[in-house]
């Protein structure tokens, strides 16, 4: 049939990524055979070709669940969040289920998240996981929102039972490498194939066909049941919609071929009643068939020898009763298919004797046939969930900024899983949050060497190189990423970091803005833009960028930190304290945020609280020199020079090449009237190439130390 041919060609082109050709053929298909199924197929072609606007226009107004899901997805791609939500939830009372199952709830969760409705989005992501425990993206979103439950709970026994139930419902056969859905579809393909060959029936059968299609034989509401079949999310077959008028149950019901009928019942007897109820049962099967995918039935015809035996070359259905004795024995073929259950083998207290004997023989010959399959199923589910538990633990800890716990979780993985790109990226990010830039560099470098085509996380890698001041490596990385994908926001973030390291903030800002053009929801790019505006002392623009980042992700603590630094530089200390507090609520283990929060407290004359915050920062990360330096600064301002000297002497051992440490020691020795040591440390500070502004200040201090001695010498003369 023309419709079948075009539909198969469209699917083949989609599988081979020939999207434009698929669109062309699907437009022909829809013009010749207008139906909701073909409309959905064309929408998929448009979406595959990044033409969400085209899918939006052709699906607008569709009411079937699958069309609503595709329309909502198109709206989401076009940033029409209100229309997307309305398509997924047409009723305010939520009486109608969200189309798409787990995917529909996940999409609705994203819509709620980007609309600023955090609690609703959390609910939808949890619903997605309840529908499909393997919907990892939903768990990842929950981690990002800070609302994820422990992985052992999410991927525990309930998830295992859910997956087992789903697999049983889908009739997965692990041992034979094919699903029982395909076997069932091949049985139903028998009826479709028989119908499609009615043109080859001899003349007398043509007359019988007219008699068979008389209105008196049509069951009530048959058309209505087939045309409004509930629209399960599987795509119905357009072939079935075309041959509705032929009414396949009636064709088989009225055939006067006893031998053939017996053979047919030997195939479908596991779910067919006796002759009196044959039409009703087949009508129900036709209704069920309308919810199945066309591609699955076609695959079943190709793979299953049963369905192949009833093609155009197999005309044995039309033989006389005597000739039909030489037809292939279908009852002998039934052993190749799985028997569903003894309940389906009998109906209304009766069973076909031939079927019953074949089922009994099958059960006797293979009494524990399902045991290996069930064991394989349970074993496979257990392995998958065990892996997801480890990954989930690490991911959850990382988003809670418990980086040490995250690293310990990832170390439980096998070597194969640990060396995957995603895990190496997570490990690198964990070290990055710990400010262990050398280990972070090692992890990111390994990931980039093994997977040079993967760009996810490269923005963080470029920031690591920025902090390590690896200008040459950062420039090489930026060029490499741009050559791989110029349309990736991560690539342009790397370029921007390269220019920022060179103090070319204007060019860096343009690079980060280019990343935002490619992905408006790329939170880190907005934050980096804010940093560059702050470096240019354009604080209003910096604040605007940080606000945009927080509009996308309220748990992006870097933006809260950036706002705090902006207010701190503007001497708005109360506002700065509030922003640092919000940042600490998200990342309570950041010694950098604690340090600057302490500075804001100190500037507000809350010195005791400031000292406590500095000590907490030192305990959190003893390797970070910043809290120790500012602790000494606060002690110096309070006149406690000896404690400040002790802190700086310890810090000097950790950071001997830091000019600011020696300059601070020079000031303290000056206050303690140990002028020789003060001059020594000021000289060391100048030798370590401080910034021009710091160099001017250090020279001014040295002049104050030398000038009194000169005056004393002149007076003696």
Curated annotation (Swiss-Prot):
It is found in: Nucleus. Keywords: Cell cycle, Cell division, Mitosis, Nucleus, Repeat, TPR repeat, Ubl conjugation pathway. Residues 293-304 have a biased composition (Basic residues). Disulfide bonds: none annotated. One of its GO terms (cellular component) is anaphase-promoting complex. One of its GO terms (biological process) is cell division. It holds the Pfam family TPR_1. The keyword Isomerase does not apply. It comes from the Eukaryota. Belongs to the APC3/CDC27 family. Component of the anaphase promoting complex/cyclosome (APC/C), a cell cycle-regulated E3 ubiquitin-protein ligase complex that controls progression through mitosis and the G1 phase of the cell cycle. The APC/C complex controls several key steps in the cell cycle by mediating ubiquitination and subsequent degradation of target proteins such as cyclins. The APC/C complex is required for the female gametophyte development and is involved in several aspect of development by controlling cell division and cell elongation. Involved in the control of endoreduplication. The APC/C is composed of at least 10 subunits. Interacts with APC2 and APC10. This is Cell division cycle protein 27 homolog A. The lineage of its organism: Eukaryota, Viridiplantae, Streptophyta, Embryophyta, Tracheophyta.
